[in-house]
A protein has these predicted regions:
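A shared catalytic/ligand-binding motif for oxyanion handling
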Residues: 1-196
Length: 196
């Protein structure tokens, strides 16, 4: 019997790519960012704002990327997008669950491979704000969409939810008081070589 210790994380990265002086840079190319995310056997990046043209730029050595993206409109900027990374050593026990749309990526951990009581589904989700142009245009109720996808999983699986659920807390704290927030460094320092 194999015993696995999984480290699973998820972050809203508010755009995986940055355009600096006409050059496109990926946060995945930043050594600090990559060092942090690569400590986890499974990690999800939410609101990557990528399109199908960017999929090859999302690949990370040693990981399989499962992604969902929205179509780029003729005018306007990119929105949404999810990229889920699974370390190659775990791939025999992980499968992507086919879903429609670009708001959710679900993967299933096989109970036999991971020595679990039941199969476990990890749902990485981005819920667009209700007043966003995307929701206004598509009339998508992201919570209803998520509920529909979860109802298809059945009763014999455990489910883990990760993502950005656009929770509004009003005047209450939307974080745990006293929590150590040094887990994910803010990464905005891009070293650009050859530019002055």
């Amino acid at each position: 019997m194999k015993i696995f210790e999984l480290s699973i994380q998820c972050w809203n990265v508010s755009c995986i790519f940055t355009n600096i002086n006409g050059f496109k840079y990926s946060k995945l190319d930043n050594p600090l960012f990559f060092d942090h995310v690569s400590r986890h056997s499974i990690f999800g990046l939410i609101e990557t704002q990528h399109t199908s043209d960017d999929i090859d730029k999302l690949q990370v050595l040693g990981y399989k990327c499962f992604q969902a993206c929205r179509k780029k409109l003729k005018y306007g900027r990119k929105h949404g997008g999810i990229a889920v990374y699974v370390h190659n050593s775990l791939l025999p026990g992980v499968s992507k669950i086919a879903t429609t749309g670009s708001e959710t990526v679900q993967i299933k951990l096989d109970r036999d491979i991971f020595s679990l009581d039941r199969d476990t589904v990890i749902s990485f989700t981005y819920c667009s704000p209700a007043n966003s142009s995307y929701v206004q245009r598509t009339q998508l109720d992201t919570y209803e969409d998520l509920e529909q996808k979860l109802s298809c999983l059945g009763q014999d699986v455990d489910i883990i939810f990760l993502g950005d659920f656009i929770a509004r807390t009003g005047t209450r704290l939307d974080y745990i008081s006293g929590e150590d927030n040094t887990d994910m460094p803010d990464v905005y320092d891009y070293h650009i070589y050859g530019l002055s």
